[in-house]
């Protein structure tokens, strides 16, 4: 990487700009545009770095208003040379995700659309619907994000009827399978009545459904049925026949888009209001719509920006799928800025030609029009939800007599059972929407709170101190401070928080209220009576959603702590087994029962557990006189 820095914009220094451009090689790679403060403004990729970077500073080159504004601020150019264009594409995506440059088109991290996850990292993988991708398990596979969550759940339920799959995260019984095994919904994973290899073969067939390869799966099952019949395994053949028939019902529910078509294709379109863009990606395989994916991104105002958004979506999507899921054709509403590079990369990944098509024929144009209509419907739905949130924030600002809308609202709640395992939650709403990346848990450490005696007031005071003390001491900036704090409770809980905020000289920095559960009453500091509101007001409903989310988050964490403590209580009695090794044991075996049943050899498979400690653990659960 080469860094070139100027105290002013490079546009103001043509000779210096030309020297900088000459330093950049004509090789594939990634380039960075930075301002005079060293902040990264834009990250891009190119087959020929110098040619691409030079194009930004040519008057004849058409630019969007956003890029034109960015170019005026560029005082620094950096680059990383890669061996191939494909490496440049992958590196660019990772760097944009890491740095979030202001002038790049950024996809919104939306939790609204669900994924299907298959946990290939586990010995017996599970399949389930989730709205959050786990980044720490590289082997796990995600399909989506799907727009229609109802249809997705119906599909998964039907699949679980067709193929016997693992249903539970933890076994229900110790020495026998549960009812799911008896009714044929599970192959008895908990008792290892099926080998991991055979189970994974079944799950590979399920994965083919979400890869859009149902026709290929139908052919595979037909071959297996015929082979079973030829081998006189008639019961197995009948079971596969039933699977084929059920699979036909699954396909029957899918919309026919291009009859008699055998080509795999994706069609993508975008609708934007200038503030946000809704993108729809339709996956069509053998003439049937097998997947409808949705994304959100920054707003666009021109065809050039539309192409940038679509390019970013396609790059992110195809980098996360397997080669068999890449279609032979992608239907586009407009040209992509780096379409040739993306096309070459997709072709190399797939192993066969991938075509980008701006449709001229009526059938494909009608298909693209259908995708565009769905993108527009999704944008309108999002606009209505945004308007609803704005109405709630405006109503809340009026109730609390705030000068501006509360952009960031934090809610706090305490959870415990008679003072034991006391924990607190901090949840955050931004623009009226939950922002889970800012949620926090707190374990209450106050030594004055004894087991068997609860003290919500002291617990809340401790949490508020821990939340803001770093910012007060100057160790953290104050950009993440809330506009409004809501406490779950009544006047007592509010008074405890107000008291500690006064000590920290923070009471005038933001508004603090409490929301009592029984009548949804809002209390302000120093007021003996609640504010005159009614429960159906949009602002009150917003606070109630915040309060309920804080309560849910606190109770969930408290339940985890109780479970963890109950698991560790017996392990604490084993000499030489510290806390970190206890965690490794539980992570490996998943339950205390499995640790108890493990052999010395199996115990030694856990990192950090040597032969002597493994024998000690085994002897603890298997005393000689038992």
UniProtKB/Swiss-Prot annotation:
Domain GIY-YIG residues, every copy: 26-105
One GO BP annotation of this record: SOS response
Pfam families: GIY-YIG, HHH_2, UVR, UvrC_RNaseH, UvrC_RNaseH_dom
Keywords: Cytoplasm, DNA damage, DNA excision, DNA repair, Excision nuclease
Similarity section: Belongs to the UvrC family.
Protein role: The UvrABC repair system catalyzes the recognition and processing of DNA lesions. UvrC both incises the 5' and 3' sides of the lesion. The N-terminal half is responsible for the 3' incision and the C-terminal half is responsible for the 5' incision.
Subunit structure: Interacts with UvrB in an incision complex.
HAMAP family named among the record's database cross-references: UvrC
Name of this protein: UvrABC system protein C
Source species: Synechocystis sp. (strain ATCC 27184 / PCC 6803 / Kazusa)
């Amino acid at each position: 990487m080469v860094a070139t820095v100027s105290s002013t914009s490079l546009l103001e220094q043509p000779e210096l700009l030309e020297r900088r451009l000459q330093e950049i090689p004509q090789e594939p790679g990634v380039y960075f545009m930075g301002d005079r403060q060293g902040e990264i403004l834009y990250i891009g990729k190119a087959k020929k770095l110098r040619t691409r970077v030079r194009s930004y500073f040519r008057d004849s080159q058409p630019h969007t208003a956003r890029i034109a504004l960015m170019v005026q601020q560029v005082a620094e150019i950096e680059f990383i040379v890669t061996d191939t264009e494909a490496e440049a594409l992958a590196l660019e995506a990772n760097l944009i995700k890491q740095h979030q440059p202001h002038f790049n088109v950024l996809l919104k991290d939306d939790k609204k659309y669900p994924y299907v996850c298959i946990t290939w990292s586990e010995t017996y993988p599970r399949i389930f619907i989730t709205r959050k991708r786990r980044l720490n398990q590289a082997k796990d596979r995600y399909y989506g994000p799907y727009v229609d969550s109802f249809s997705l759940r119906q599909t998964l339920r039907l699949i679980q009827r067709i193929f016997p799959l693992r249903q539970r995260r933890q076994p229900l019984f110790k020495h026998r399978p549960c009812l799911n095994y008896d009714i044929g919904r599970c192959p008895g994973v908990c008792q290892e009545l099926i080998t991991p290899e055979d189970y994974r073969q079944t799950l590979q067939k399920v994965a083919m459904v979400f890869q859009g390869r149902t026709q290929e799966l139908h052919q595979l099952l037909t071959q297996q049925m015929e082979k079973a019949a030829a081998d006189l395994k008639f019961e197995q053949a009948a079971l596969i026949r039933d699977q084929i028939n059920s699979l036909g019902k699954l396909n029957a529910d899918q919309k026919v888009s291009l009859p008699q078509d055998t080509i795999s294709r994706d069609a993508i379109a975008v609708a934007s209001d200038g503030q946000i863009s809704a993108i729809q990606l339709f996956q069509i395989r053998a003439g049937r719509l097998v997947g409808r994916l949705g994304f959100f991104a920054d707003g666009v105002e021109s065809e050039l920006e539309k192409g940038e958004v679509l390019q970013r979506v396609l790059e992110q999507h195809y980098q996360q799928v397997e080669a068999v899921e890449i279609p032979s054709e992608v239907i586009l509403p407009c040209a992509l800025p780096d379409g040739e590079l993306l096309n070459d990369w997709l072709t190399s990944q797939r192993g066969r030609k991938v075509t980008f098509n701006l449709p001229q024929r009526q059938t494909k144009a009608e298909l693209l029009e259908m995708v565009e209509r769905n993108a527009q419907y999704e944008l309108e739905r999002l606009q209505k939800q945004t308007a609803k949130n704005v109405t709630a924030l405006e109503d809340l600002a009026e109730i609390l007599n705030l000068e501006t809308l509360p952009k960031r609202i934090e809610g706090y709640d305490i959870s415990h059972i008679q003072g034991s395992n006391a924990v607190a939650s901090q949840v955050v709403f931004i623009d009226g929407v939950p922002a889970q990346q800012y949620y926090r848990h707190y374990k209450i450490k106050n030594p004055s709170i004894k087991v068997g005696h609860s003290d919500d007031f002291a617990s809340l005071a401790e949490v508020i101190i821990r939340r803001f003390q770093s910012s007060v001491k100057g160790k953290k900036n104050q950009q993440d401070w809330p506009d409004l704090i809501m406490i779950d409770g009544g006047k007592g809980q509010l008074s405890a928080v107000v008291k500690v905020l006064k000590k920290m000289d923070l009471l005038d920095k933001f508004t603090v209220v409490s929301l009592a559960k029984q009548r949804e009453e809002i209390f302000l500091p120093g007021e003996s009576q609640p504010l005159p509101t009614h429960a159906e007001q949009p602002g009150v409903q917003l606070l109630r959603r915040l309060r309920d989310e804080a309560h849910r988050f606190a109770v969930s964490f408290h339940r985890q702590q109780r479970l963890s403590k109950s698991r560790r209580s017996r392990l604490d009695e084993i000499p030489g087994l510290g806390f970190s090794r206890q965690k490794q044991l539980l992570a490996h075996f998943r339950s205390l029962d499995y640790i108890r049943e493990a052999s010395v050899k199996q115990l030694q498979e856990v990192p950090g557990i040597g032969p002597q400690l493994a024998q000690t653990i085994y002897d603890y659960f298997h005393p000689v006189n038992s």
